[in-house]
Amino acid sequence: MDKKEVIEKIEAIVATSVNHHEFTMTEATKQEDVRAWDSLANAMIITAIEQEFGIKFKFMEMSSWKSVGDLANIVLAKVEKL
């Protein structure tokens, strides 16, 4: 699995979680760039990502990412350790 595939899966999870499918996600996309991606949606997104990839985030990891690219890097690092 590469970073592009991870971002595509994250995009699908975000779109479903915020019920908004009219955006294109890139590595530079930030939470505030997506309408309705609030703190409640963020909790749902994190849970869905953990389930999709079979991983668990630590608190510091969840608060450290600033963009989807950062999040994808964390996911990739965790998946590689499985």
Pin down the residues of each PLM region.
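Phosphopantetheine-dependent thiolation modules in NRPS/PKS and related acyl-activating systems
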Residues: D2-W37, A41-T47, Q51-L82
